[in-house]
């Protein structure tokens, strides 16, 4: 049985004059426990995903890794 993620909210992340959209999803992993995911598409085919036990933790993790991720992509 497939259970789809539920979009909880979206936020904008600003970095060096560019805006990136961060989508926060909840995925029911088990009966009592849910997994939260933050997803940001940097370009077609280049998506960054972070997870956490809460929406806030997933968002915080994504906001922490995005600057490094964006900078590393600019080096390629």
Question: What is the predicted function of each stretch?
Answer:
Residues 6, 25-27, 73:
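Compositionally biased, intrinsically disordered low-complexity segments
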Residues 43-76:
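Mixed-charge, Lys/Arg-enriched low-complexity segments
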Residues 1-23:
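Negatively charged, low-complexity tracts enriched in Asp/Glu with abundant Ser/Thr
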Residues 12-13, 29, 64, 71:
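Intrinsic disorder/low-complexity segments in short proteins, especially the signal peptide
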Residues 26-47:
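Short aromatic-glycine-(Arg/Gly/Cys) micro-motifs in beta-strand/loop hairpins
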């Amino acid at each position: 049985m497939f259970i789809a993620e539920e979009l909880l909210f979206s936020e904008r992340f600003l970095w060096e004059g560019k805006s990136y959209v961060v989508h926060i999803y909840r995925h029911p992993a088990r009966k009592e426990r849910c997994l939260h995911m933050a997803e940001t598409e940097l370009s077609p085919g280049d998506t960054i995903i972070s997870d956490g036990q809460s929406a806030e933790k997933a968002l915080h993790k994504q906001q922490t890794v995005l600057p490094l991720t964006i900078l590393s992509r600019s080096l390629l």
